[in-house]
Amino acid sequence: NRLSFGVQDLDEEVQKTIHRIQPFELTQNVIKIARDAGIHSVNTDLIYGLPLQTRESFKRTLEKMLTLNTDRFAVFNYAHVPWLMKTMRKFDESTFPKPETKLEMLKDTIDFFTSNGYKMVGMDHFPKPEDELFKAIEKGELHRNFQGYTTKGGADLIGIGVTSIGNGVDYYAQNFKDLNEWEEAIDKGNLPVFKGYRLSDDEILRQYVIMELMSNFSLNIKKVEEE
Protein backbone atom coordinates (compact mmCIF):
# COMPACT_ATOMS: atom_id res chain seq x y z
CA ASN A 1 0.00 0.00 0.00
CA ARG A 2 3.04 2.31 -0.09
CA LEU A 3 5.86 2.77 -2.59
CA SER A 4 9.22 4.51 -2.35
CA PHE A 5 11.14 5.69 -5.40
CA GLY A 6 14.84 6.51 -5.43
CA VAL A 7 15.47 9.71 -7.39
CA GLN A 8 18.63 11.21 -5.82
CA ASP A 9 18.93 14.23 -8.14
CA LEU A 10 17.36 15.58 -11.34
CA ASP A 11 20.34 17.49 -12.73
CA GLU A 12 21.49 15.84 -15.97
CA GLU A 13 25.21 16.36 -15.34
CA VAL A 14 24.94 14.92 -11.83
CA GLN A 15 23.03 11.91 -13.16
CA LYS A 16 25.67 11.27 -15.83
CA THR A 17 28.45 11.50 -13.27
CA ILE A 18 26.86 8.98 -10.89
CA HIS A 19 25.80 6.73 -13.81
CA ARG A 20 22.12 6.95 -12.92
CA ILE A 21 20.17 8.43 -15.82
CA GLN A 22 16.60 8.91 -14.64
CA PRO A 23 14.64 11.64 -16.44
CA PHE A 24 12.05 13.56 -14.45
CA GLU A 25 9.35 12.36 -16.86
CA LEU A 26 10.13 8.73 -15.98
CA THR A 27 9.68 9.37 -12.27
CA GLN A 28 6.56 11.42 -12.96
CA ASN A 29 5.07 8.59 -15.03
CA VAL A 30 5.69 5.76 -12.56
CA ILE A 31 4.25 7.83 -9.72
CA LYS A 32 1.11 8.41 -11.81
CA ILE A 33 0.89 4.66 -12.48
CA ALA A 34 1.19 4.01 -8.74
CA ARG A 35 -1.56 6.51 -7.95
CA ASP A 36 -3.83 5.07 -10.63
CA ALA A 37 -3.24 1.59 -9.19
CA GLY A 38 -4.54 2.74 -5.81
CA ILE A 39 -1.26 3.20 -3.95
CA HIS A 40 -2.23 5.67 -1.24
CA SER A 41 1.22 6.74 -0.08
CA VAL A 42 4.26 7.54 -2.22
CA ASN A 43 7.73 8.48 -0.98
CA THR A 44 10.69 9.75 -2.97
CA ASP A 45 14.33 9.68 -1.88
CA LEU A 46 16.77 12.48 -2.67
CA ILE A 47 20.48 12.77 -1.87
CA TYR A 48 22.59 15.86 -1.27
CA GLY A 49 26.38 15.90 -1.44
CA LEU A 50 26.69 14.17 -4.83
CA PRO A 51 29.43 15.06 -7.34
CA LEU A 52 28.81 18.32 -9.24
CA GLN A 53 25.87 19.27 -7.04
CA THR A 54 25.53 22.92 -6.05
CA ARG A 55 23.06 24.69 -3.80
CA GLU A 56 21.40 26.17 -6.87
CA SER A 57 21.14 22.89 -8.79
CA PHE A 58 19.72 21.05 -5.79
CA LYS A 59 17.16 23.81 -5.23
CA ARG A 60 15.99 23.25 -8.80
CA THR A 61 15.62 19.54 -8.05
CA LEU A 62 13.56 20.30 -4.94
CA GLU A 63 11.30 22.70 -6.85
CA LYS A 64 10.65 20.19 -9.61
CA MET A 65 10.07 17.29 -7.20
CA LEU A 66 7.51 19.35 -5.29
CA THR A 67 5.27 19.35 -8.36
CA LEU A 68 4.86 15.57 -8.02
CA ASN A 69 2.95 16.08 -4.75
CA THR A 70 4.36 12.94 -3.11
CA ASP A 71 3.32 12.17 0.45
CA ARG A 72 6.84 11.96 1.86
CA PHE A 73 10.35 13.00 0.96
CA ALA A 74 13.47 11.44 2.43
CA VAL A 75 16.59 13.54 1.85
CA PHE A 76 19.80 11.71 2.73
CA ASN A 77 23.40 12.82 3.02
CA TYR A 78 25.60 11.13 0.41
CA ALA A 79 27.98 8.60 1.96
CA HIS A 80 31.20 8.23 -0.02
CA VAL A 81 32.45 4.67 0.59
CA PRO A 82 34.65 3.74 -2.39
CA TRP A 83 36.18 0.84 -0.44
CA LEU A 84 32.72 -0.78 -0.44
CA MET A 85 31.25 0.48 -3.73
CA LYS A 86 33.50 0.06 -6.76
CA THR A 87 31.46 2.50 -8.85
CA MET A 88 32.32 5.29 -6.40
CA ARG A 89 36.03 4.91 -7.16
CA LYS A 90 35.41 6.57 -10.51
CA PHE A 91 34.15 9.78 -8.92
CA ASP A 92 36.44 12.80 -8.96
CA GLU A 93 36.50 13.76 -5.28
CA SER A 94 37.32 17.36 -6.18
CA THR A 95 33.78 17.68 -7.59
CA PHE A 96 32.05 16.94 -4.29
CA PRO A 97 30.38 19.86 -2.49
CA LYS A 98 32.41 21.07 0.48
CA PRO A 99 31.13 20.17 3.98
CA GLU A 100 29.95 23.73 4.62
CA THR A 101 28.08 23.69 1.30
CA LYS A 102 26.39 20.42 2.24
CA LEU A 103 25.19 21.99 5.48
CA GLU A 104 23.74 24.88 3.50
CA MET A 105 22.04 22.40 1.17
CA LEU A 106 20.48 20.66 4.15
CA LYS A 107 19.29 23.99 5.55
CA ASP A 108 17.88 24.92 2.13
CA THR A 109 16.03 21.59 2.04
CA ILE A 110 14.53 22.05 5.51
CA ASP A 111 13.44 25.61 4.73
CA PHE A 112 12.00 24.60 1.37
CA PHE A 113 9.84 21.69 2.49
CA THR A 114 8.66 23.24 5.76
CA SER A 115 7.58 26.37 3.88
CA ASN A 116 5.66 24.27 1.35
CA GLY A 117 3.37 22.36 3.68
CA TYR A 118 5.60 19.49 4.78
CA LYS A 119 6.73 18.67 8.31
CA MET A 120 10.25 17.69 9.31
CA VAL A 121 10.46 14.32 11.03
CA GLY A 122 13.68 13.17 12.66
CA MET A 123 16.85 14.11 10.83
CA ASP A 124 15.94 13.76 7.17
CA HIS A 125 12.28 12.95 6.44
CA PHE A 126 9.55 15.34 5.30
CA PRO A 127 5.97 13.99 5.32
CA LYS A 128 2.70 15.83 4.85
CA PRO A 129 0.89 16.67 8.13
CA GLU A 130 -1.75 14.00 7.49
CA ASP A 131 0.85 11.28 6.83
CA GLU A 132 1.08 8.50 9.42
CA LEU A 133 4.81 9.19 9.79
CA PHE A 134 4.12 12.66 11.21
CA LYS A 135 1.31 11.34 13.39
CA ALA A 136 3.73 8.76 14.79
CA ILE A 137 6.19 11.38 16.03
CA GLU A 138 3.36 13.24 17.75
CA LYS A 139 2.54 10.00 19.61
CA GLY A 140 6.19 9.16 20.33
CA GLU A 141 5.87 6.05 18.17
CA LEU A 142 8.39 6.86 15.46
CA HIS A 143 11.03 4.22 14.72
CA ARG A 144 14.10 4.03 12.52
CA ASN A 145 15.85 1.19 10.76
CA PHE A 146 18.86 1.28 8.44
CA GLN A 147 16.65 2.44 5.57
CA GLY A 148 15.06 5.40 7.32
CA TYR A 149 12.08 6.24 9.52
CA THR A 150 9.07 3.98 9.88
CA THR A 151 5.93 3.55 11.96
CA LYS A 152 6.46 -0.22 12.09
CA GLY A 153 8.82 -0.68 15.01
CA GLY A 154 10.03 -4.22 15.67
CA ALA A 155 8.82 -5.56 12.32
CA ASP A 156 11.20 -7.85 10.43
CA LEU A 157 12.49 -6.45 7.16
CA ILE A 158 12.81 -9.12 4.46
CA GLY A 159 15.25 -8.48 1.61
CA ILE A 160 14.13 -10.13 -1.64
CA GLY A 161 16.07 -8.85 -4.64
CA VAL A 162 19.74 -8.70 -5.58
CA THR A 163 21.94 -6.92 -2.95
CA SER A 164 18.91 -6.37 -0.69
CA ILE A 165 19.37 -6.38 3.07
CA GLY A 166 17.04 -7.88 5.63
CA ASN A 167 17.07 -7.56 9.39
CA GLY A 168 15.26 -8.73 12.48
CA VAL A 169 15.66 -8.23 16.20
CA ASP A 170 19.14 -9.74 16.38
CA TYR A 171 20.46 -10.16 12.85
CA TYR A 172 21.28 -8.60 9.49
CA ALA A 173 21.48 -10.56 6.23
CA GLN A 174 22.40 -9.49 2.72
CA ASN A 175 21.57 -11.20 -0.58
CA PHE A 176 24.05 -11.89 -3.35
CA LYS A 177 25.21 -8.82 -5.26
CA ASP A 178 25.67 -10.80 -8.46
CA LEU A 179 22.47 -11.62 -10.37
CA ASN A 180 23.74 -15.01 -11.59
CA GLU A 181 24.60 -16.12 -8.05
CA TRP A 182 21.23 -14.86 -6.81
CA GLU A 183 19.37 -16.79 -9.53
CA GLU A 184 21.42 -19.95 -8.92
CA ALA A 185 20.50 -19.94 -5.23
CA ILE A 186 16.80 -19.43 -6.04
CA ASP A 187 16.85 -22.21 -8.66
CA LYS A 188 18.27 -24.59 -6.04
CA GLY A 189 15.54 -23.66 -3.58
CA ASN A 190 17.95 -21.83 -1.27
CA LEU A 191 17.79 -18.39 0.26
CA PRO A 192 20.02 -16.09 -1.84
CA VAL A 193 21.87 -14.84 1.25
CA PHE A 194 25.65 -14.58 1.05
CA LYS A 195 26.50 -12.93 4.36
CA GLY A 196 24.95 -12.07 7.68
CA TYR A 197 25.66 -10.80 11.17
CA ARG A 198 24.21 -11.87 14.51
CA LEU A 199 23.98 -9.12 17.14
CA SER A 200 25.02 -9.70 20.74
CA ASP A 201 22.73 -8.69 23.61
CA ASP A 202 24.91 -5.62 24.19
CA GLU A 203 24.68 -4.62 20.52
CA ILE A 204 20.90 -5.01 20.57
CA LEU A 205 20.72 -2.65 23.55
CA ARG A 206 23.05 -0.11 21.92
CA GLN A 207 21.05 -0.31 18.69
CA TYR A 208 17.80 0.37 20.55
CA VAL A 209 19.26 3.40 22.36
CA ILE A 210 20.75 4.88 19.18
CA MET A 211 17.58 4.38 17.15
CA GLU A 212 15.43 5.85 19.92
CA LEU A 213 17.60 8.98 20.05
CA MET A 214 17.54 9.30 16.26
CA SER A 215 13.76 8.89 16.19
CA ASN A 216 12.42 10.85 19.14
CA PHE A 217 15.49 12.83 20.33
CA SER A 218 14.87 11.61 23.87
CA LEU A 219 15.42 8.48 25.92
CA ASN A 220 13.13 6.85 28.46
CA ILE A 221 15.58 5.13 30.82
CA LYS A 222 12.84 3.05 32.44
CA LYS A 223 11.73 1.81 29.03
CA VAL A 224 15.33 0.93 28.14
CA GLU A 225 15.67 -1.08 31.34
CA GLU A 226 12.43 -2.92 30.56
CA GLU A 227 13.63 -3.73 27.06
Each model region followed by its residue ranges:
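C-terminal scaffold of the Radical SAM
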Residues: 1-227
